[in-house]
A protein has these predicted regions:
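Short, flexible loop segments at boundaries between secondary-structure elements
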Residues: 224-232
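Active-site mouth loops of central-metabolism enzymes
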Residues: 15-22, 83-93, 172-177
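Catalytic domains of cell-wall/extracellular-matrix polysaccharide-remodeling enzymes
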Residues: 92-183, 191, 195, 201-218, ...
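Juxtamembrane proline-rich low-complexity "stalk" or linker regions positioned immediately after a signal peptide
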Residues: 1-2
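Glycine-rich anion/phosphate-binding loops
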Residues: 47-51, 88-97
Length: 232
């Protein structure tokens, strides 16, 4: 369409890092995304049927693998991961043990971001316990920013853990056209601010949307980068 031609002809500048959350449930979208050969960063939920397979596919494709660490949301009834979720009423030792176990289950990861976690990422004591493990293991932390008042990235910075914060979610809608519109919104954000971080999910519609626009995004002048290159 004419609209898309105009977008591609416009030269954007800046760096865009894209994190693919929820890897471990379904392998097909992960394979499809990895096959695009874009430097995406993949956040894997621990202990899922395909967590190890996803790690293998991601590392095999030369991409960045991360742990998608389940953390307590404001509404506990909405918690998707039950017993493996970091809770704010756990002791520091319990938090560290759960974090370490999840990290160890995915050898070769480079960093961590939070799954859910609006309550946990706004709790300083909980974040300090998680980040202590990450610091010991040389891992970075990306605050998924599921909650505007989360302080995960601030606490990480204060502890000397390399960190960054998500700026935009791309696939709150499962409609392909909506996802594509959000991808261009993220490109524009990266152009405006010099860089941006976007999160989407390992789902069929998301993989299909990226397949449609990846060439245009690459041609637009925006540079897709691993999230590790935008850490502060």
């Amino acid at each position: 369409t004419k609209k898309d031609d105009k977008k591609t002809a416009q030269k954007y500048h800046g760096k865009l890092a894209v994190i693919i959350d929820d890897c471990g449930y379904d392998l097909a979208p992960v394979r499809k995304l990895v096959n695009l050969n874009a430097p995406f960063s993949y956040a894997i939920l621990p202990y899922k049927d395909f967590s190890s397979d996803a790690l293998h596919v991601i590392k095999g494709g030369g991409q960045t693998a991360m742990l998608h660490l389940p953390m307590e949301p404001m509404d506990r009834t909405a918690m998707s991961e039950g017993k493996i979720t970091i809770l704010t009423d756990m002791t520091a030792e319990q938090v560290q043990q759960l974090t370490r176990k999840a990290v160890d289950s995915l050898p070769g990861i480079e960093g961590v971001n939070n799954h859910q976690g609006s309550k946990a990422t706004s709790n300083e004591a909980t974040m300090k316990a998680v980040l202590k493990v990450l610091k010991q293991q040389g891992l970075f932390f990306v605050d998924s920013s599921t909650y505007s008042k989360s302080i995960g990235d601030q606490v990480a910075r204060s502890m000397g853990v390399p960190t960054a914060r998500n700026n935009i979610f791309l696939d709150n809608s499962s409609d392909e056209d909506d996802i594509i519109a959000k991808i261009w919104q993220a490109v524009e954000m990266a152009d405006r601010n010099g860089s941006a971080i976007a999160i989407c999910h390992a789902r069929p519609h998301t993989a299909a949307a990226w397949s449609k626009v990846i060439d245009e995004v690459n041609a637009s002048g925006i540079q897709l980068v691993p999230v590790s290159s935008l850490l502060k």
